[in-house]
Amino acid sequence: MSAQKPMISPYEVNELTKYCLNILTYTDELRSDTALKQAYEKAKELENSIRKLKIASLMENKTLICVAGMQGAGKTTLMKNFYGLKGDALSIELGRGERIPVLITETDVTAPVMNAIRIQKNEAGEYAAVECNMEANEFAHASKGEDNSILYLEMFVPYRHTYNSAVSFMLLPGFEKK
C-alpha cells in the first residue's frame, strides 16, 4: 500500500490566497525605493499564483468542465454556438483567443453578464480579489491577459443546458504546437 500525501484543504487554499494578497500589500511600498524595485517586481509575480489558488478554491463549490485545445481550434466559437451568443458577447479575438481562464456559468439572467475577478486595493489600502462588471469590449480586451491584475473572467448566461449555476465551462488558453 502506498502512502498518499494529504491533500490541501479548501480552508488552506483560501488562507494561502489571503497570505499572497497580504504580501502584495506589504511589498507595494517597495515600488518607490529604486533599490527595492526588483523585490517589488518579483512580488508582483505572485499574481499568477493567486490566480491558480482562486481557481483551485472554485473547485470546492463548482464543477468545472474544461474546454481545452490548440490555439485557433475553435474553443470560443464552440461555446458561442453552444449558448447561441450573438453580437459582442464572448467576442474574443479569433485565432489568438483568451490568455486567461474564462468561465461560462448558467444562472438566472436574461442576457449575458460579464465579470472580471481582479486584484485591486480596497479602502484600507490592502489588496483583495474583487468581482467587477465589464462591458463586452472590456471583457474581450481583458481576455488577452495583458492586465496581470485580472485573475480570471466569468460570463453569466441564461439557463440553457445545465440549469445549474454550480457548473461552469472553463475556456482555457490555447496551447501551441512546438
Language model segments and positions:
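Conserved Switch II/interswitch segment of TRAFAC-class P-loop GTPases
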Residues: 173-177
